[in-house]
């Protein structure tokens, strides 16, 4: 990607594309961790997950799918506070879990209400990482469960 305007206030892929007059499928942006160019699918996934771009040296960076998952695992090991059921989470934050943003701890996608409800119905715990509550999205739930099923 050509050097973006250093005065840009873009925080998301969508904002960056609008400010630089680019279409999302033609955007070439590097991963902040491994420096590889994100594929078109990864660019769209990054936007879908409502993640913010990172600015370094007046250049925008995102994160590829592989590095997002690795970073999720690293955060689990380095910043694990504790795990709790939805009732405990709600008591701690004084809000319904349906009223707060909870991201997947692996892929970082914000959980929808159905994914939060699944935690409740299946009595799965949310985990607190670095003072933020996290859970599992449907995609990561399935991949986690594949390892324990016969």
Swiss-Prot record:
Zn finger (unnamed) start-end: 31-67, 104-140
Cellular component per GO, a single term: host cell nucleus
Gene Ontology MF terms in the entry: DNA binding; zinc ion binding
Places the protein is found: Host cytoplasm; Host nucleus
Pfam families: E6 (PF00518)
Keywords from the UniProt entry: Activator, DNA-binding, Early protein, Host cytoplasm, Host nucleus, Host-virus interaction, Inhibition of host innate immune response by virus, Metal-binding, Modulation of host cell apoptosis by virus, Transcription, Transcription regulation, Viral immunoevasion, Zinc, Zinc-finger
A GO BP annotation: symbiont-mediated perturbation of host ubiquitin-like protein modification
Extent of the signal sequence: none
InterPro entries in alphabetical order: E6, E6_sf
Keyword Repeat: no
Task of the protein: Plays a major role in the induction and maintenance of cellular transformation. E6 associates with host UBE3A/E6-AP ubiquitin-protein ligase and modulates its activity. Sequesters tumor suppressor TP53 in the host cytoplasm and modulates its activity by interacting with host EP300 that results in the reduction of TP53 acetylation and activation. In turn, apoptosis induced by DNA damage is inhibited. E6 also protects host keratinocytes from apoptosis by mediating the degradation of host BAK1. May also inhibit host immune response.
Family membership noted in the UniProt record: Belongs to the papillomaviridae E6 protein family.
Subunit structure: Forms homodimers. Interacts with ubiquitin-protein ligase UBE3A/E6-AP; this interaction stimulates UBE3A ubiquitin activity. Interacts with host TP53 and EP300; this interaction inhibits TP53 activity.
Note: Belongs to the low risk human alphapapillomavirus family. The cancer-causing human papillomavirus E6 protein has a unique carboxy terminal PDZ domain containing substrate but low risk E6s do not possess this domain.
The protein's name in its UniProt record: Protein E6
Species per Swiss-Prot/TrEMBL record: Pygmy chimpanzee papillomavirus type 1 (PCPV-1)
Taxonomic lineage: Viruses, Monodnaviria, Shotokuvirae, Cossaviricota, Papovaviricetes
């Amino acid at each position: 990607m050509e050097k973006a305007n250093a005065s840009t206030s873009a925080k998301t892929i969508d904002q960056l594309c609008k400010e630089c007059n680019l279409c999302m499928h033609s955007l070439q942006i590097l991963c902040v961790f491994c420096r590889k160019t994100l594929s078109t699918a990864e660019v769209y996934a990054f936007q879908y997950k409502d993640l913010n771009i990172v600015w370094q040296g007046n250049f925008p960076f995102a994160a590829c799918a592989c590095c997002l998952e690795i970073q999720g695992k690293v955060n689990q090991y380095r910043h694990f506070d504790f795990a709790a059921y939805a009732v405990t989470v709600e008591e701690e934050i004084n809000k319904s879990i349906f009223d707060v943003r909870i991201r997947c701890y692996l892929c970082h996608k914000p959980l929808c209400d159905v994914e939060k409800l699944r935690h409740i119905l299946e009595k799965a715990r949310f985990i607190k990482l670095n003072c933020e509550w996290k859970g599992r999205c449907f995609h990561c739930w399935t991949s986690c469960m594949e390892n324990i099923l016969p």
